From Swiss-Prot:
The keyword Transport does not apply. This is Outer capsid protein VP2. It comes from the Viruses. One of its GO terms (cellular component) is viral inner capsid. Its main location: virion. One of its GO terms (molecular function) is structural molecule activity. Keywords: Capsid protein, Inner capsid protein, Virion. It is found in: Virion. Pfam families: Orbi_VP2. The keyword Iron-sulfur does not apply. The VP2 protein is one of the two proteins (with VP5) which constitute the virus particle outer capsid. It is the major target of the host immunogenic response.
């Protein structure tokens, strides 16, 4: 292999310059993006950055929220950072990560190189040196005075709003002034002149866990299907009387647009159809609900469903976007057929002869149809006459069954009044179109034998439905019908059939009537007894009139319950049954039940929209309301020590609509806002709405302030916390989120050994005095908490421990390497056993971790009056991602003081050993694939756009042959910050096989390597260009498959 490596700098590639292709890398000025600076933010001419080869970036105008959560695939890009190189060299293993991506470069065959398009110009790489080439982005700092400029503007805006006559603004202004005071107090103690933090990783990781923001209560508002008759601002919910509105056209559920998860699922169904992944997503969503569940066993497998959908979806004719939203397949075929007909009156009887020459081509089409489809559609022949007689008899029978009153019936895929005389030109056309569509679909239909469904009914029914989403949703219901018949409800919660029904009924609440009207199928589905409630958020559309409803609110307050107490009569008999079954070595997945079954009280956090329900009708046919809870009463569950919750009535009269990014945002009660770190401590977090702080465009737009950011600061102020003001708001919000989480978790799990025994109310009130922590990466945060709780002071390799804790083959050994955990595991005392609940945090709070939703119930140790026991907790708790809200509330109560040093009996010791083994061997999944797997540098660009700007780099790792495998790092850019590059590449540069760093910035060279690098000239046919030549000396460039060989050894 060659011992020299050449990098050519030229204006552009010219014809007949093949001599230059000997260079290993070519950097040109073609396609260079213009640099643009505005208000101190260094950026680019962003419209020039769209769809560049090698960069996973589409339109710069796409919102950052859509970029993160909706851009599913990048049409390829070279790896953002090939961590596998570090893993192989440093750890000797291939780690399954989620930060690789597909390539979107181009093979430039004329010169035998691979082309990419970074912002500083087109580049071409020799294939043998390309696999370890990647992009890096540097977000730049800005003056802290610029960062803090929003404070005054925000206060002026709030004061202006408070000047209006509107209830509640006085409290808002008071809270805003407390926030302002805390912000300026922080500023007094901050000495930096420029933004001090830009690390992307903390934001990246908490975005994956959906913790970059705050939560506030959903408003459960009366559905517009009801007219309130006795609802007033002073009347209690239980006193409400409602009138049902007459049902009109079946529409999508009112709650649909307010449910982000359901909305995303619907968008995926429309785009991706009923693939197996979509069917799984439908089941995963519906499995959370139980409005139609029962005890029936479900035998409909996912494979069977997939086969059903594979056949049923062939009946669906999606709208043709390029021909207008109302242009369905039937309309297109009908219009095409009419074009070939002579001019005729469609309301008159169908009569036509071959006579005139103008009719010849029409009859030729009729003859061709007969040859191709074996159906005679000649209007003068017997087939059409027989069809007229059959349809006329059908219409007469339908009208007689309707007390001889006309009604619409489905004929040939369209609706016709029974009072019409059948046999017109229009009727003939509809008949022919129906035959054409049926013939076309039959050619597409997969071979599948339906038990109950009829192909012709399916076809005509689907043709009448409006919208692809409705068609696909009803395909799932039709599959249930064909498999089970009319009885499609009452299956166990979480089963395939139950989950499908739950999802479809949320999308289309009145689907039963539409299935009956369009397909002639009567489904045995009970009318829902609960009152129709729609779930509303800040972004919902509210009526200009008053709307009424309720919300859940929760918090923590000191009361009679003691932290040092055992779980008492709130535990159900199922706890003892579970204990017995585990003693008999029965498998957890086989014996575990819904966590609610282990308690006797009712929290109603699973189905909050059903707390108030219809209790029948009064003599005036008003719907009477009853409730499982009493409005305004504060409940303290015996499950917890200081936790409280209640239902409060709300009215939308005092909602003020504000405009933000061309959308309406309603002002909810700010006192309810909670930062995610605190909101997730409440079991009722599932009744709250997560509001993300992903604001603005994905790049090139600086957001100085926003309503969401203001609300987040108010949420912090509610708990006496303030974020830092010496860095950009994105890094500041990420930092305070991780700081609060660290302080809270450490305080909770250090209580026993510190003998403080504080309840959660006390811990939260102490946040104002807690240390302000900062973590450059999520791994630093994770390990910091781990070592603080376990009182471990060793120097630990971050990457290694996180990798080995994820690996079930190594996790046990790593856990037992911590002295405190090993002591708890060996101890015979109850207090030490309860400390083992920290394993829950160790496992589920790892970076990138996800959990199989079908196995979301996991064990937690509790101290009952009968001894050490285990209950199941829900690691999702009806939320979209893994959440602490389903398990952390249960560790508030410890045990009675007298039991703290009680020795465990043999059965309890066996339970504790089983508990440790469970978490030591629990398999985990990676979260964020594929949607978040290529977003890291995009997030860096977004952060830089909201601070001092961004710089674009390309980094290349060159393998070298020597006694040990080695790497040379080369960084390319327009204005390179060498110190930043060295920091970013420290994992490579600190390795013993590193040969150092070479930086190429335009025509400038910085050599910090062990090799000789010369800046030479290369002459080629009238052009003199620069050539950077790296001489290998005793080293040899190449071994082009070195990385593949390394990985092969590591696997």
């Amino acid at each position: 292999m060659a011992s020299e490596f050449g990098i050519l700098i030229c204006d552009k590639l010219k014809e007949n310059t093949l001599e230059k292709t000997n260079c290993d890398v070519i950097i040109t000025g073609v396609g260079k993006v213009g640099v643009h600076e505005e208000d101190g933010v260094l950026g680019y001419e962003w419209e020039e950055t769209n769809y560049r080869l090698g960069l996973c970036e589409i339109e710069n105008t796409m919102s950052i929220s859509d970029f993160v959560y909706k851009q599913i695939r990048c049409e390829g890009a070279y790896p953002i950072l090939p961590h596998y190189v570090t893993d192989v060299i440093k750890y000797g293993m291939v780690i399954h990560r989620n930060d690789h991506q597909i390539r979107v470069d181009r093979d430039e065959k004329s010169i035998g190189k691979i082309q990419i398009q970074p912002y500083f110009g087109d580049m071409y790489f020799s294939p043998e040196y390309y696999p370890a080439t990647f992009i890096k982005r540097e977000s730049l700092p800005i003056s802290v005075d610029t960062i803090r400029g929003y404070i005054g503007a925000r206060m002026r805006g709030i004061e202006a709003r408070a000047g209006r006559i509107r209830e509640g603004d006085g409290n808002l202004l008071e809270c805003a002034r407390r926030w302002e005071k805390a912000a300026y107090e922080r500023i007094e103690n901050e000495k930096a002149l420029r933004c001090v933090a830009h690390e992307t990783d903390p934001t990246y990781q908490i975005l994956k866990k959906q913790r970059f923001g705050f939560v506030y209560p959903h408003y459960y508002v009366l559905n517009t299907n009801y007219n309130p008759t006795t609802v007033t601002r002073t009347s209690r919910i239980n006193d409400w009387l409602l009138k049902e509105k007459t049902q009109g056209v079946v529409k999508t559920a009112e709650a649909f647009s307010d449910n982000a998860e359901l909305k995303t699922l619907a968008e995926r169904m429309e785009e991706e159809e009923l693939t197996e992944d979509i069917i799984r997503a439908v089941i995963r969503y519906g499995a959370k609900y139980a409005t139609r569940s029962g005890m029936r066993e479900d035998t409909l497998s996912l494979q069977e469903l997939d086969r059903y959908c594979d056949s049923l979806t062939t009946f669906v004719h999606k709208k043709k976007k390029d021909e207008g939203d109302d242009e369905t397949a039937r309309t297109i075929i009908r219009n095409q057929w009419i074009k070939g007909m002579p001019r005729m009156d469609f309301k008159k009887e169908m009569k036509i002869t071959r006579g005139p020459i103008a009719n010849w081509s029409f009859f030729m089409s009729i003859d061709a149809f007969k040859r191709n489809n074996k159906v005679d559609i000649n209007p003068n022949h017997q087939t059409w006459k027989d069809h007229i007689k059959e349809v006329t008899d059908q219409m007469n029978r339908a009208q007689q069954g309707n007390n001889n009153k006309p009604l619409k019936v489905q004929i040939d895929g369209v609706s016709i009044l029974t009072s019409e005389k059948y046999g017109t030109v229009g009727h003939w056309v509809d008949w022919v179109v129906d035959l054409i569509m049926l013939a076309q679909v039959k050619m597409l239909i997969k071979e599948y034998k339906f038990k109950r469904l009829n192909s012709q009914n399916l076809m005509s029914g689907m043709n009448k439905l409006v919208g692809a989403l409705r068609c696909y949703a009803y395909c799932l219901i039709l599959a249930l019908y064909d498999y089970y018949g009319q009885d499609i409800e009452g299956f166990k919660k979480g089963s395939n059939s139950s989950a499908i029904l739950e999802t479809v009924i949320q999308m289309f609440p009145n689907f039963k009537q539409e299935i009956q009207a369009n397909f002639g199928i009567n489904l045995n589905i009970k009318d829902k007894k609960t009152i129709a409630i729609r779930r509303a958020t800040m972004h919902s559309d509210f009526s200009s009139n008053e709307e009424y409803g309720y919300k859940f609110v929760f918090g923590w307050a000191a009361r009679g319950e003691e932290v040092l107490s055992n779980y008492g009569d709130v535990l159900s008999d199922e706890v003892e049954e579970l204990f017995t079954k585990l003693r008999k070595k029965e498998h957890w997945d086989k014996v575990v039940e819904d966590p609610e079954s282990y308690f006797i009280d009712e929290l109603y956090q699973k189905n909050p929209a059903e707390v108030f329900y219809s209790a029948g009708y009064d003599t005036d046919q008003n719907v009477v309301i009853d409730g499982k809870m009493t409005e305004g009463v504060t409940y303290f569950s015996k499950r917890f020590v200081s936790y409280w919750y209640r239902v409060e009535k709300i009215t939308t009269k005092h909602l003020e609509f504000l405009t933000e990014e061309n959308r309406k945002v309603a002002q909810f009660d700010f006192e309810d806002y909670k930062p995610m770190a605190i909101g997730e401590m409440g079991i009722h977090a599932s009744t709250y709405k997560y509001e993300s702080l992903l604001l603005g465009k994905n790049r090139g737009q600086k957001v100085n302030d926003s309503i969401a950011l203001c609300n987040y600061d108010l949420a912090l102020t509610n708990f006496g916390v303030s974020r830092r003001q010496d860095c950009c708001w994105i890094s500041s919000c990420s930092a305070i989120e991780l700081s609060m989480r660290a302080n809270i978790i450490i305080a909770i799990f250090r209580r026993i050994e510190d003998k403080r025994y504080e309840n959660f109310a006390k811990i939260l009130s102490g946040l104002t005095q807690q240390q302000d922590l900062y973590f450059p990466t999520y791994k630093h945060y994770y390990l910091f908490v781990l070592q603080k709780v376990l009182r471990d002071e060793r120097r630990i390799d971050l990457n290694r421990i996180c990798t080995e804790l994820f690996d079930t083959q190594r996790r046990r050994g790593i856990l037992l390497s911590f002295t405190a955990l090993r002591f708890w595991n060996d101890s015979e005392f109850l207090g030490d056993a309860l400390m083992m609940n920290f394993l829950h945090r160790v496992v589920f709070e790892m970076e990138n971790v996800d959990v199989d939703y079908g196995k979301k119930w996991h064990p937690l140790l509790v101290s009952s009056e009968k001894g050490l026991r285990v209950i199941a907790v829900d690691v999702f708790n009806s939320m979209m991602g893994v959440s602490t809200s389903g398990w952390l509330p249960y560790v508030e109560r410890i045990c009675s003081e007298s039991d703290m040093r009680r020795r465990l009996n043999a059965d309890e010791l066996e339970l504790k050993r089983w508990f440790f083994d469970y978490y030591a061997t629990l398999p985990l999944e990676r979260r964020g694939e594929p949607r978040l797997s290529f977003k890291y540098e995009g997030l860096t660009t977004w952060i830089g756009s909201n601070c001092g700007g961004v710089r674009d780099y390309v980094v290349q790792l060159l393998p070298m042959r020597k006694s040990k495998p080695g790497l040379l790092c080369i960084a390319y850019g327009d204005d390179v910050n060498v110190q930043w590059v060295e920091h970013e590449l420290r994992d490579f540069l600190m390795h013993e096989g590193s040969l150092g760093l070479v930086v190429i910035s335009g025509k400038m060279l910085v050599n910090k390597s062990k090799l000789r690098v010369r800046n030479l000239k290369i002459y080629n046919r009238g052009t003199l260009d620069s050539l950077f030549l790296i001489s290998g000396g005793n080293y040899t460039f190449g071994n082009k498959f070195l990385l593949s060989k390394l990985m092969a050894k590591a696997e």
